[in-house]
Amino acid sequence: DHEAAYATLIEGMDKSLGDLMDWLEKNGEADNTIILFMSDNGGLASTSEWRDGPLYTQNYPLLSGKGSLCEGGIREPMIVSWPGVAQPNTRCDKYLLIEDFYPTILEMAGVKDYETVQPIDGISFVPLLTGTGDPSKGRSLFWNMPNNWGNDGPGINFNCAVRNGDWKLIYYYGTGKKELFLSLIHI
């Protein structure tokens, strides 16, 4: 049963994270440690050999999954623990990109005067964690996936997308098809 195996993996990850957090607490480091916990993409939804059930439904209500530019492939939850800074038990539905982690971690670490070989693409999301601002407001996000994942499905293979607010446009290189979405809650 694929779902039982998947649940076992999740249970193992949960146990490992719990062990780490217990160690930090036991050794007096919990209040001096920032934890960022997230996935790198939506769940695998385009192949039946790893999961049970109909394809492209594993991230319901979001459409599709890993390798897709639909919301099931690019929207992932994230948990942040930053004692004394990020308010516990709060929720934020703003969006960001992986490129935002580098400037965020630098800011969290108090690194201010640094030099880079090239410009930093990301924007620190510390204001979202402190409740002092919204760096995603008015910002466009871009994805380019000109590769073949070996499977086909919603938002998968040879495409690119741009998102601004609740609007997203997906363009399929192979067919020239365009899909425009508004209100990204269920796509």
Where are the model-predicted features located?
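Aromatic- and acidic-residue-enriched carbohydrate-binding clefts of CAZyme catalytic domains
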Residues: 1-2, 56
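Beta-strand elements within well-structured catalytic alpha/beta cores of enzymes
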Residues: 6, 10, 17, 34-39, ...
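Alpha-amylase-like alpha-glycosidases and glucanotransferases acting on alpha-linked glucans and related
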Residues: 37, 68, 74-75
